Amino acid sequence: PFDRSINPYRGCEHGCSYCFARPTHAYLGLSPGLDFETRLIARPEAPAVLARELRSKRYRVATLAIGTNTDPYQPLERDRGIMRACLEVLREHRHPVAIVTKGTLIERDIDILSEMAAMGLARVGVSVTTLDADLSRRMEPRVPAPKRRLATIRRLAEAGIETRIMVSPVVPALTDPELEAILAAGAEAGAAAASWIMLRLPLEVAPLWKAWLEEHYPGRAGRVMARLREMHGGAEYSAQWHRRMRGEGQYAQLIAQRFDKAARRLGLDRTLGPLRSDLFRVPARAGDQLSLF
């Protein structure tokens, strides 16, 4: 868990049918459905705001998470470059960062990330939900194909960047049969560790997800939702931390056991240590008064 994060964008072009962040668009008076995917908000001021925060005398260093809400490497980043500018600020200050993404555009920033990783300042998590390209196209319509994301894991790992494969989300009765195969593919690509999160359906996500499920997989819809209710005490979602992320009950325990067994066998059960915070610095700027002591 992280106590601080930034998001260079609100909304996400990836259009994942299951995205738990969709309700955040409702706070802006926009729909969590199509608006979330098409009416995007870029934050070009983010790098300057970040630099100002890091220069504050009140600031205390801790790993900064990027991508915990919306993907910083969605297609819009290719033209805007806000994420890269944020990384440049973090590199200049030698500040630790952990990134979560499905976007292969992160390869563009390997030059910065490899330099930071060599100092123990950067780590990446790449989410692979399924290895089935057809299912991925339906469920994550504008996300790079699973094989392409695995290639990104390989390139990051080869550059010395500690990378975790994230099976996120696990969809009951739809993607759960692939759990071991996804982990094996991640290990083969060079992932250093692995994690998983169960499908979450907060607020407006639930009706959007159910509509998608009925359209694309009507024969499995009842079973998918029954499994979710089984894990959440009869409800489709629980906001309690542990139940929200992993669920409870026999099925949730089975998924956890399968994951743990496969991760151990593949060497992905490592606990990654903390990133370094002792290298943090505030670079001098033109006009700063230099200390004589």
Model-assigned labels for residue ranges:
Residues 131-133, 140-142, 155-176, 198-201, ...:
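Conserved strand-turn element in the central/C-terminal portion of the radical SAM core barrel
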Residues 114-116, 142, 184:
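Short, solvent-exposed amphipathic alpha-helical segments in soluble enzyme
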Residues 1-10, 14-125, 129-137, 146-158:
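Conserved Radical SAM active-site core
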Residues 64-65, 100, 163-167, 195-197:
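Short beta-strand segments at enzyme active-site cores
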Residues 103-107, 171-180:
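Active-site glycine- and acidic-residue-rich loops that bind
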Residues 117-121, 162, 188-192:
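Glycine-enriched alpha-helix->loop->beta-strand junction motifs that scaffold or abut catalytic
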Residues 89-95, 151-163, 231-234, 258-269:
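A structural motif corresponding to the C-terminal end of an alpha-helix
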Residues 177-293:
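Auxiliary Fe-S-binding modules of radical SAM enzymes
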